[in-house]
Amino acid sequence: MGRRTYLSRSSTISYPSRIEGWLDVCETEGELTRLIKTLPWGPLYCVLQQDDQTFTAYCSEEISLGDVCYEDIPRVRLDRVRRPAKALWDGPPTLVEENEDSDSCVGGSGGMSGINDIVLNTTLYSELGEYKSKTLPRIHFDTALNDTSLNEDTSYEKACRRGSAPTTPILGSKQHQTEHNATSRFTNFFSKKSNPLKRTKSVTKLERTKRGSGGLRGSRSHESLLSSHAVMSTIDLSCTGAVGVAPVHQSVLGRRHCFQVRGGPRGERYYSCGSRQERDLWIYSLRKSIAPNAEHTRRTDNSLKMWVYEAKNLPPKKRYFCELQLDKTLYGRTSVKLQTDLLFWGEHFDFPDIPEINVITVNVFREVDKKKKRDKYQFVGSVKIPVHDVTSRLPCEQWYPILSDKAGDSLGRTSGGGGSGSKDKEQLPTLRIKCRFQSTDILPINVYGNFLTYLKENYKRVCETLEPVIGVKAKEDIGQALVLLMHAQGLAGAFLTDVVALDLLRVGDQRLTFRGNSLATKSMEAFLKLTGEQYLQDTLSAPINELIQSERDCEVDPTKTSGSSAGSLQRQQAALRGAVRGAWQCIFESHKHFPAQLRNCFATFRERLQQLGRQDMADNLISASIFLRFLCPAILSPSLFNITSELPSARATRNLTLVAKTLQTLANFTRFQGKENFMEFLNDFLEQEAARMQQFLEIISTRPEHPAPDSILDWAGYIDQGKQLSILHSLLSESLAKLPEARQHELDPLQHILDEISRAKEHGMGTALPGGYLPATSSTHSIASENQENRNPGSSGSHAGSNSEQLLPQQSQLAQPQHAIVSKPLSAERGIMRGVLTPNSLEKNIFRYNDPTVNGLLQQQQQQQQQQQQQQQQHQQLQQHGHQQQPHHQHPLQMLSNSQTSIAGNQYMSSPGGLQHAQSQTSMASSSLNGSSSNLLHGHQQHAHHPQQLHPHHCPPAPQTSASSTMERMDRMNYPYMSHNGNDYETSTPSSTRSRTLPRNGNPNANGNVGSSNNNQSGSYDDMHGEFQIQISGFDTSSAFVCKSPTPMMKSSLGPAGAGRSHHKLNLGIPDHSGGYVRGNNLNPNSNMPKNLEDLDDLFKYAEEHDVAEPANHHNHNQGQQNHQGHLKPAAVPGKEQLSAKSSHCSSGYQSISTNPSPSQSSSPVESQLKAAMGSHNAPLAFKNPSYQLQPQTGSSRSSAQSNTHQQQQQQQQQQFGSRLKPIGGGLVAARAAFLNSGGALEAATLTPSSSDEQLSADNYFSYAAAAAAGAGIATKLEAQRSLSGGSSSSTSASASTSNLGKSGGSSAYGRLNGPLKREDVYGSGYGGSSGNVGYGLSTSSAAGHHQHPHQQQQNPMQQQQQRERDQEHKQYAGSVAGSVGSATSAAQRRLSLDSARTLSDSSTDTEGHCNQLQEGKRRRQLRSSGGSGGGGAGSEQGLGKSYDQNGEIQLLQQTLDTLCHTLDRDEAELRDSSDELFGLQRPAGSNGSNNLSLQSESTMRSIIDRLITMEEELRREQLKMSLALSHKQRVIEEQGQQIAALDAANSRLLSALTALRQRYETQQQQQQHQAPPKTQKPQ
């Protein structure tokens, strides 16, 4: 036996349930026009089975009970009136008699309507071309089906008409597939029986097609009414994405409270409900059945509000109306107005829950002469409004030109219209429209859990704190959202009571109760509209419509009734008295059906006032709530409260105004007097009805003794709480910024909760797409504009790692212009909404097709095939190499920092479905200032990206970066890493490996293509040794590169070597050799650059122990052999090399992360030295405007420790400190922290180019010092020229191993002097050198016999000459003049500007923190030097070593660092905003110095943050002062207005008194005159 259902007596709808009730249903033709005056509505008993996802309409309630016994779910009845099926046919029969000898469609004559007929009901899928017979189920006509047998009148149809067709399904059984195709329409009931014998006319093929193809013919006779296909019809709601439910505006169907079920095989049906609450519950139940988990997913809610006001410059004496279309779909229609002196509609349209649209179209029509039967309406023109123009916070009001499709006539008029296309522009017809499109990004409801809890517990404190600082519009929005949210939570009464009590205590004056615009009044208005709309219509519809339809005149002001007699004035006064009495009687009688929710709320008001001892204010408060804020405004403007559909006439408006004025005076318990003395004839009515008014207020504010059971229509569960919480998040985030900091702390932890939600939106909570839910990228800004991002759901791309697959769904956002980086789209520049930026929609959208911001999407389809091929290759290559890390978890959300300067920049995740990217304010993935979090994209899929050129002047500065914490967490979770990608686009062609931050003219093609499997092999973290390896891409030397880009473009011509390598390496745009591409003959055999700081220690020890220098050539040869052997060994072991991890900033303030490394370069960017002598594979310095030039001078060198020893020491250091690696340095503080955490195991690094403001990094500080120390040991002379001027935005740098970075891009390399800000500080270092000086860049002059690149020899003669002169000037500060056995000078020079010197150190402890030698005391080192050293200070080697005064050097360094410390303290704010221009110094760090430096770095960062916070507080205080001043002025104005009103009233009273006195005086005068004549006759 089946299970029984039970009728739910509760006031809630639980899922799943059986929802049922009577509805008026209409199913219209797709081409139905206005020739049909009445729509075929009919009552049907509708049943929604939420568990089965079916929506069935029955002709009777009894038939619907056939399947009740088989279910065990609650039943909920929504209709208010139990009605029979046959009693309420409110229209003509739905099936009109068809004359067999005519071809007329509905209406009888004329056939199909002309092109000027306006479609009454259009579908949202009109492009499908639906055709159907009015007696058949709606089908989609397929032009490919031309079989005439499908359209023939079959014998089964004849049997149906005779009633002899078999009844196939049993009543009550579930019908799924058969119902969609075989059910007949329910609108065929009670149709006239058609005589089959009359069907004698032959029907053409075209007419048969029009009648419909497929499906069964419906019943044509009364005998077959009992068959199941004639008494029920079912809609399957399980078609996800194909079936939708939406409310329908009353102007479309001519009925209130309608909704539409669109999609599915049957097309569209319209349902009319008895009230708005009933309609909302049906829509909620249907949507819940379609998508039960919608509230737990990320979604977007779109709404549109429009006001169509007036038109001008249209031909007069015509009747006009407008139709509102959203993407060619009819959503509303205005009333018909006659053009006289003014053509004014003034109608408001609210379209909630609309899909994503592109264009708003307003079509203007006019009625033609009645004699013309065919064309009753003529198209005048249209107004097209792009959606992105009306997405601002406030509604946008504007005059729009009415444009016609006709070329010669802008009005589309006939010859008698009186206009032509040559009309002046001033006479162009225009339409005044105000509209606002709002898109709300809604996160899953669980994300708002803390926010909802806070609001429920602290709404009173929030309202009290925000009240003084927010405007009227914000009060209205916040109040409405809070009311809806609290009503859904069952706290509306308590919420309103608390906020109203606050308002009463603040105002104090009883006469001003609810007179202002406060949160309390706006919240009360929202609650009244929410719960009392049906009550308002039931109460006031009859008297208002009667007053509007009647032509009686109620004007009683003598000044406005000039020429009227006293009799007519009395008649008008009597008419007004009757209208007022009728309206008041309806209101008084309405207490019988007064809403229970409002009654409870008003009862709570009375109880709270009694507790406060203000019982005297109860009646005033309740009357102000119900009359001042609800009933009287509804009488005054009935169209705003949906009582009428259009504005009443001028006379009716005046009548309604007088009625509302009288009722409001009655509710205030006052009398007419003063300036409204013409209304004094109603004072007797006011006195008589005052008692009844008090009785009415008492009744509606008293809880009944026997409360009625809760009605299902009062259930508030249908309210979308996620939408209201999203709106409140946006509004409160904006409002809190207006508060002073002290007041903000009063609302703690509200700011923290709001920030968490903002981060959740930026991280990208799951978004519902066909492929699943995806993490969405977003910009650093939240949705005050809402919004919002432009997404296009696409297919998911897959990637197989080892034996598992993970899907990465994607989104597509609005592509940015190629000439700029847009950090945040303005609210007015929102663009097209999410989900509609597809090439197909853009081709149809004339407003966006030529927009440069969407060119990338128009090319998206052409690029998808190429991306799929590349990703397949990546997948195959990846399986060959294999993953070292096997994922065991789903991908987490992107971990983003809270700071705007540390949010991930444009992150691209490309898969076969399209391109995903986001807008960001910063240029690279970065961490917050404290380095606690970072933003690393992670994924298993190889991503191929589209190249795009960005203008260098639009590049924002790069933030400080720290990634070790996230890398460490992700490594523990076995998540591989994706490469950092700022606002750079990575090319999809494997051969092009260059930075894409600036325009380039070079040839992107390479001699040899790098395998596509290396597209993402840019950086890895070694699990065994804790080494974060950074893969550096090579440079392209083949193409001429003469652009202004300061970043090198390099290329590889190698083939794969087959070695397995790490698949996740951070690519920073510098040559790479750590993996599977090895070219033995290109390896540098003579590179002796150290791999880490331990190599420097070896050099120091070696310099102390050996007093005799070896010959230069011999040493260089031996060292080259050692380094050659030491390099080949680690090259075969993937993941064990320490590359240049510290100079990670690329040009233009961006970090370019390439997925195509060029392994032709050596594994260290500072180790190659003889590349210039080896062939044509040298990578030129493609610098247009270099400020850094490293001059190579070949010569003698000293040997460093072998690479094997270096690798062992390096691995030990990495095992000890690997868990705290911070591989990317973005600033001085972050770089120091990275250096300390890494345990000193850093490599030599390069000075990377930059074209933004200066920001020196301690990462390069150390790494360049390593290069300099090694370079001091050999005969290679490096010159680090830095010439920076204030505001300079171009500087370049190169690797210390400048031999393989040879040629400059054909530009002048002369250093620019800095004028008065120039400062030259020269620190000399000998061979081995003092550790205090080793870290500085070396500057040497060219020596004879040493190899140098010809470009550098040509470009730098002046610099070399200046260098030699400065060497002579600063000899006394040089540590050792003799550098090596060669005949080269090793005097070191460092030239700095004061602007850049401030970033070298935070305090004097920097020297102690990084120089072990200086910490150990004033120990002097005996330095050996050649007798041939140029410009030596002493006559012999021993004399030169003894003459070195290290104490003076320490003092000089101390003074310099103190100066730099003061400079840093003075310019901290500028330091924070500076970009990533790097110039590094390095000294070996000791343990004590490291601790001191860490503490100093933290204190410095705290001071910077404190100063920034102080500045922000000052700005907020200024804003608060301005706001308070403005509020004060507003209050003064309001008070003055009240005083003026009081004075006006006093003047009126005085005038009345004077008038009375005058009348009395005149009366006395007349009496005296009557008595005076007898007395004056006596003297005569």
Curated annotation (Swiss-Prot):
Residues 233-291 form the PH domain. Residues 806-818, 857-885, 926-939, 987-1020, 1151-1169, 1207-1216, 1285-1299, 1351-1362, 1374-1388, 1563-1580 have a biased composition (Low complexity). GO terms for molecular function: GTPase activator activity. InterPro entries: C2_dom, C2_domain_sf, DAB2P_C, Ras_GTPase, RasGAP_CS, RasGAP_dom, Rho_GTPase_activation_prot. Signal peptide: none annotated. It comes from the Eukaryota. Residues 282-400 form the C2 domain. One of its GO terms (biological process) is negative regulation of Ras protein signal transduction. The modification Phosphothreonine is found at residue 167. GO terms for cellular component: apical cortex; apical plasma membrane. It is found in: Cytoplasm; Cell membrane; Apical cell membrane. The name 'raskol' means 'to split' in Russian, and is based upon its role in maintaining cell adhesion in the polar and border cells of embryos. This is Ras GTPase-activating protein raskol. It comes from Drosophila melanogaster (Fruit fly).
